[in-house]
């Protein structure tokens, strides 16, 4: 049913956000509701169950479309490819108990606030809905639902200081408390009965209930009883697991809801519990450690916080107060990407506070409850984003095909039994029975079996996963983005030297640690104070770069409070003093008065410091090219660029230093960043060694050999990044590096892009960080169609993405190095790679890479935390060796899923074909025969087939990602035909045997006791004869020569396909390494052969088998042996023959439809690509890329179709 697109009926919720939804208004109609209730009763609840599964049908049946303003029910639909519906009832919040009269409106809410705009007058009610724990209220004026529980974004910096700096009034607090709800992240432990009902109503168990009822009606007591025993056990285990998760999550958040805070309103300070806080409240942060109960904007003072809960990194982060800017920009726009530097996030720990001039640290509550950072984390756990992996979609489609297959069998069954004069009730039972045989309800669940065991193996290797459904995706990864510092290179940098500048000329380089005699001066003072280090439990903590720089000075941090600073009141400040090993200095200490923390967007940090009895000075440290632009031109050496290139080309990490003296009279906290970071004096370059981790080269070599492309995404200098890429083996020494520079033309809406070869700088031996001769054999980049690599900065990437978007895919195809990238640019880059149909992995340290780690198909955070919200995967070992490990396990899990899927599909089909054959003679399998096949064979195989571990070597192609690929479909179809052929052959041949008799089932074996009959099994089927209608016939129940033959052949055939489908190399270990599985198969085969050759009357009677001559038993074994040989030969010689499929693709000129592959073929024909030493302006560029490159297909051998 389509939706009315009328504006009043339809709107968008959370536009542009990750959880964007469409919302439709509906009004309940009494007559429709009455008809639905009647339908529930008449259908015995089946209609109600259907509406439970499909909430949109429930709304469409019970309600009529209306405007959102009139709606009492809303229907929500996600805007992703899944289009998932959910139903929510509209509720009303009454505030009449707070607002007594119309005259009180102004004192409760400002006119421009959502609280005023949502209040319906004169009823004094607010219309609201709650979606995924977030409350939305109806904005009467904007005619839309808006989120509450957060401070409005339109406030300016100055407005936040003036409006909320002294707190809200009691009446404002009361109104906001009622509308926003309590500041709690309330995750109640779900009662067991609720979990039980939810699990029982799962379609899988509903189908099982239907099957059990049908089996009881047909007297299939044993199998039905087995299912009744197994299902509650399975449900109980699932409910227990869900309950444990619920308890664990509740423990994670319970401390959040019981924190005491000091708040302030217009009447003064007050102690209150954190759940009373509302957006706009002002809280005072006291000294000492504390957990934050909400997101808050720091408006005075400074805080050191531990954000490991958010990023996985335990490095302390400095938060500074929001500037009091006098412009009309909203505060987030004014602060741009740096707004987080002023925000204290819920769930993080305040380690240390530093008061302002009045000794107070104040913050304004920004967001409460589930709107906070911690609330967002909890919601992501409660409502995980579904993954669009075609394997699961194909599984459901295949299930639909099996249902259609079963429908054919039902028609056949009805015809056979009806033509033989069976009762209508019996015909219906038999027809329905076909569905329970042909359609295994566990088929989609079979795809997850490999994931469960893989997750356990990963945990043993120190790789933790909070999103198991992404494990299969790891098997498809063909491009990995790596952060540089701390990921490819060592986290702890070594200080190599200082290149001081004086009088706009560089002086001699001062090496570390050989040269300890650093002279006292501005450059030395910059190294002493320009950092964000703190002393925590007696140890200096902070950024590793800052730690190395500071330790080289031999000064110490005296981090105590109450230092008297000339011209100011007593304040909490950090004082740096000379240590015992420090050189003689002319001052007793330097006090850090204020700090502007490092910003990835600005590429620098600054501090304001004051020597004891001296003047205030500002010191800046950051990217050299950025720092140089902030300095007076006459202080920057003329050979600045060549010197910078000299060191960065060797792989050094280079930091620029600058300073200036500040005029007295203005308080440090009143100075803006722009005032401080201007007209600086350039001090020199700090040179740090950026050594590769020992695992980097072997891992990148392994990925390259597997044709998995590696890309570097870093915040460092482009020359340093290119050098590290060369040393690591990402770029071969014989390949060209082309620098892409894009610039926006000032004062216009146009831009230009230039391609030029990157300058090579031959360096002296003593400066080489990592000589090329030491790298051994170089690695050829896996995915490069040409012998060149693009390198670009974050600024150029942004300009290309904005002005030359049609060129971006062509650049990304060969881009290997991205330098000076901000966190948002990293996320954008990953998304752009995904648009080219790459399966993208991202490996970083979890701090500045958070966004990219979440966006990537597989984000891997290198962190000491067991699990980080920064990414789906966390490696406790800080090494990229986890990347190939994860890919190996992902490939193994993916192949296991395919093996299980094929086995489940074939097992049900074999049983289905056997039953239909016997239906021709109005016969079927016996209860214990079904029981043996389903439990003793299939269940045990399903549990042990997934034990096979990953193959240790990564091969240069990926496993298939879709079930509808030609090799897999051919494998399934051929094996179905082999099984069908063998069963029909056995069925017909047994009837041609001289000892065969329809009526005398003991004629073949004279040694059997005279005509022992199983009266109990005979009565259980309730059939009358075998088509001939001979009145002298004896009813033998299920027992017949056809039954014995078909059942034995089909049972052992299940073992054959289990062995044939259990893939080993190249993605999993050989099958013989799975000892448990091999023992199971051998044991099951032994039991089956025993049933074939045994002559035990009681056993045969129980299993509804009849005795046959030994020659016929040997004939059955020979048929099975031929089937095994043919199946194995076809699987190995055709299905798994990679060379054959590549030849077929080449013969029929099949090409991958993946966007990047199509683009490669286009560029291979373009002799003018890449352009060198050319500049394109915006209006001069023509589009040469195919316009219709949409869609995604990743057939079986898509990853490297031309290489092999």
Curated annotation (Swiss-Prot):
Example of a GO cellular component annotation carried by this entry: endoplasmic reticulum membrane
Topology versus the membrane: Multi-pass membrane protein
GO biological process terms held by the UniProt record: intracellular calcium ion homeostasis; polyamine transmembrane transport
EC number, as in UniProt: 7.2.2.-
Entry keywords, A to Z: ATP-binding, Magnesium, Membrane, Metal-binding, Nucleotide-binding, Phosphoprotein, Translocase, Transmembrane, Transmembrane helix
Residues annotated as binding Mg(2+): 845, 849
Pfam family name, one: Cation_ATPase
TM region positions: 33-53, 220-242, 398-418, 434-454, 898-918, 930-950, 968-988, 1044-1064, 1076-1096, 1114-1134
Top-rank lineage group of the source organism: Eukaryota
Cytoplasmic side: 1-32, 243-397, 455-897, 951-967, 1065-1075, 1135-1204
Reactions catalysed: ATP + H2O = ADP + phosphate + H(+)
Gene3D superfamilies with a match to the protein in the record: Calcium-transporting ATPase, cytoplasmic domain N (3.40.1110.10), Calcium-transporting ATPase, cytoplasmic transduction domain A (2.70.150.10), Calcium-transporting ATPase, transmembrane domain (1.20.1110.10), HAD superfamily/HAD-like (3.40.50.1000)
InterPro entries: ATPase_P-typ_cation-transptr_N, ATPase_P-typ_cyto_dom_N, ATPase_P-typ_P_site, ATPase_P-typ_TM_dom_sf, ATPase_P-typ_transduc_dom_A_sf, HAD-like_sf, HAD_sf, P-type_TPase_V
Extracellular side: 54-219, 419-433, 919-929, 989-1043, 1097-1113
Subcellular localization: Membrane
Molecular function in Gene Ontology: ATP binding; ATP hydrolysis activity; ATPase-coupled monoatomic cation transmembrane transporter activity; metal ion binding; P-type ion transporter activity; polyamine transmembrane transporter activity
Name of the top EC class for this enzyme: translocase
PROSITE patterns named in the record: ATPASE_E1_E2
Catalytic residues in the record: 483 (4-aspartylphosphate intermediate)
Family classification: Belongs to the cation transport ATPase (P-type) (TC 3.A.3) family. Type V subfamily.
Protein name: Probable cation-transporting ATPase 13A4
Taxonomic source organism: Gallus gallus (Chicken)
Gene: ATP13A4
């Amino acid at each position: 049913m389509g939706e009315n697109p009328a504006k009043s009926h339809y709107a968008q919720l959370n536009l542009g956000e990750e959880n964007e939804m469409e919302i439709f208004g509906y009004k309940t109609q009494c007559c429709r509701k009455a008809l639905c209730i009647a339908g529930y009763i008449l259908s015995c609840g089946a209609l109600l169950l259907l509406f439970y599964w499909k909430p949109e049908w429930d709304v469409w049946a019970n309600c009529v479309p209306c405007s959102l303003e009139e709606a009492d029910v809303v229907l929500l639909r996600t805007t992703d490819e899944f289009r998932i519906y959910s139903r929510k009832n509209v509720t009303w919040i009454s505030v009449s108990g707070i607002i007594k009269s119309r005259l009180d409106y102004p004192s409760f809410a400002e006119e421009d606030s959502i609280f005023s705009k949502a209040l319906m007058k004169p009823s004094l009610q607010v219309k609201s809905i709650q979606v995924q724990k977030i409350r939305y209220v109806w904005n009467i004026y904007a005619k839309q639902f808006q989120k509450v529980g957060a401070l409005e974004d339109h406030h300016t910096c100055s407005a936040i200081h003036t409006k909320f700096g002294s707190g809200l009034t009691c009446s404002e607090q009361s109104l906001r408390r009622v509308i926003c709800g309590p500041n709690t992240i309330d995750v109640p432990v779900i009662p067991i009965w609720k979990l039980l009902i939810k699990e029982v109503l799962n379609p899988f168990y509903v189908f099982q209930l239907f099957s059990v009822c049908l089996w009881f009606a047909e007297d299939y007591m044993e199998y039905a009883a087995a299912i009744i025993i197994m299902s509650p056990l399975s449900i109980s285990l699932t409910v227990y697991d869900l309950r444990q998760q619920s308890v664990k999550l509740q423990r994670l958040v319970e401390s959040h809801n019981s924190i005491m805070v000091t708040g302030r309103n217009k009447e003064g300070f007050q102690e209150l519990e954190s759940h009373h806080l509302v957006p706009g409240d002002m809280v005072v942060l006291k000294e000492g450690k504390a957990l934050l109960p909400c997101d808050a904007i720091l408006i005075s003072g400074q805080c050191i916080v531990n954000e490991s809960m958010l990023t996985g990194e335990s490095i302390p982060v400095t938060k500074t107060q929001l500037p009091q800017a006098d412009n009309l920009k909203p505060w987030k726009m004014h602060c741009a990407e740096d707004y987080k530097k002023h925000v204290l996030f819920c769930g993080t720990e305040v380690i240390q506070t530093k008061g302002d001039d009045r000794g107070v640290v104040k913050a304004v509550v920004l967001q409460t409850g589930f709107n906070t950072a911690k609330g967002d984390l909890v919601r992501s756990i409660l409502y995980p984003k579904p993954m669009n992996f075609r394997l699961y979609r194909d599984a459901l489609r295949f299930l639909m095909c099996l249902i259609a297959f079963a429908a054919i069998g039902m028609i056949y069954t009805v015809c056979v039994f009806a033509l033989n004069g069976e009762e209508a009730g019996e015909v219906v039972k038999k027809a329905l029975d076909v569905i329970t045989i042909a359609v295994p309800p566990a088929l989609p669940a079979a795809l997850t079996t490999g994931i469960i065991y893989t997750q356990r193996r990963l945990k043993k290797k120190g790789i933790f996963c909070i999103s198991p459904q992404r494990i299969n995706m790891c098997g498809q990864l063909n491009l990995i983005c790596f952060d540089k510092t701390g990921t490819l290179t060592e986290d702890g940098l070594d200080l190599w030297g200082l290149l001081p500048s004086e009088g706009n000329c560089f002086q001699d380089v001062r090496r570390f640690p050989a040269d300890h005699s650093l002279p006292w001066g501005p450059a030395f003072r910059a190294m002493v104070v320009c950092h964000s280090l703190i002393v925590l439990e007696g140890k200096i903590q902070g950024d590793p770069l800052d730690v190395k720089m500071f330790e080289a000075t031999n000064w110490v941090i005296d981090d105590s409070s109450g230092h008297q600073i000339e011209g100011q009141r007593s304040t909490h400040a950090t004082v740096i003093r000379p240590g015992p090993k420090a050189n003689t200095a002319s001052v007793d200490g330097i006090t850090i008065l204020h700090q502007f923390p490092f910003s990835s967007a600005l590429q620098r940090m600054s501090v304001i410091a004051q020597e004891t009895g001296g003047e205030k000075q500002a010191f800046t440290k950051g990217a050299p090219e950025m720092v140089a632009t902030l300095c007076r031109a006459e202080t920057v050496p003329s050979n600045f660029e060549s010197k910078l290139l000299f060191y960065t080309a060797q792989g050094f990490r280079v930091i620029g230093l600058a300073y200036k003296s500040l005029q007295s009279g203005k308080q440090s906290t009143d100075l803006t960043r722009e005032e401080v970071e201007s007209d600086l004096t350039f001090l020199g370059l700090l040179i740090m060694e950026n050594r590769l981790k020992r695992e980097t080269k072997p891992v990148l070599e392994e990925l390259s050999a597997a044709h998995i492309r590696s890309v570097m995404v870093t915040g460092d200098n482009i020359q340093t990044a290119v050098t590290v890429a060369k040393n690591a083996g990402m770029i071969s020494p014989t390949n060209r590096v082309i620098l892409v520079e894009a610039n926006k033309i000032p004062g216009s809406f146009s831009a230009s892009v230039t391609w030029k070869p990157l300058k090579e700088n031959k360096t002296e031996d003593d400066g080489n960080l990592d000589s090329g001769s030491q790298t051994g054999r170089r690695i050829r980049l896996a995915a490069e169609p040409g012998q060149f690599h693009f390198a670009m900065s974050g600024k150029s990437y942004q300009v290309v993405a904005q002005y030359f978007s049609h060129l971006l895919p062509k650049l990304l195809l060969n881009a290997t190095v991205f330098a000076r990238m901000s966190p948002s640019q990293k996320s954008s880059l990953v998304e752009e790679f995904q648009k080219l149909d790459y399966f993208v992995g991202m490996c970083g340290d979890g701090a500045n890479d958070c966004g990219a780690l979440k966006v990537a198909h597989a984000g891997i955070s290198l962190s000491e935390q067991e699990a980080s919200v920064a990414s789906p995967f966390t490696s406790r070992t800080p090494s990229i060796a986890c990347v190939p490990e994860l890919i190996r396990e992902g490939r193994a899990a993916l192949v296991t899923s395919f093996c299980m899927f094929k086995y489940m599909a074939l097992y049900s089909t074999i049983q289905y074909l056997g039953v239909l054959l016997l239906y021709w003679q109005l016969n079927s399998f016996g209860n214990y025969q079904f029981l043996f096949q389903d439990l003793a064979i299939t269940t045990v195989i399903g549990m042990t087939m997934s034990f096979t571990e990953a193959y240790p070597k990564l091969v240069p192609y990926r496993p298939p990602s879709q079930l509808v690929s030609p090799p897999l479909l051919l494998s399934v179809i051929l094996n179905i035909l082999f099984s069908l052929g063998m069963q029909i052959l056995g069925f017909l041949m047994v009837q041609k045997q001289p000892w065969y008799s329809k009526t005398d089932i003991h004629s073949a074996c004279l040694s059997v006791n005279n005509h022992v009959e199983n009266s109990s099994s005979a009565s259980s089927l309730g059939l009358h004869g075998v088509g001939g209608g001979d009145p002298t016939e004896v009813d033998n129940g299920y027992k017949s020569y056809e039954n014995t033959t078909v059942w034995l052949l089909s049972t052992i055939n299940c073992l054959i396909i289990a062995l044939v489908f259990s893939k080993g190399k190249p993605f999993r270990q050989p099958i013989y390494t799975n000892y448990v599985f091999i023992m199971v198969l051998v044991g099951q085969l032994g039991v089956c052969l025993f049933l074939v050759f045994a002559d035990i009357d009681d056993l045969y009677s129980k299993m509804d088998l009849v005795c046959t001559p030994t020659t016929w038993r040997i004939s059955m074994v020979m048929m099975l042996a031929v089937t095994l040989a043919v199946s194995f030969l076809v699987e190995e010689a055709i299905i798994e023959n990679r060379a054959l499929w590549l030849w077929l693709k080449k013969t029929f000129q099949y090409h991958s439809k993946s966007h990047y592959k199509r683009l490669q073929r286009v560029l291979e024909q373009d002799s003018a690509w890449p352009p060198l030493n050319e500049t394109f302006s915006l209006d001069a560029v023509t589009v040469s890329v195919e316009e219709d490159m949409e869609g995604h297909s990743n057939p079986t051998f898509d990853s490297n179709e031309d290489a092999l």
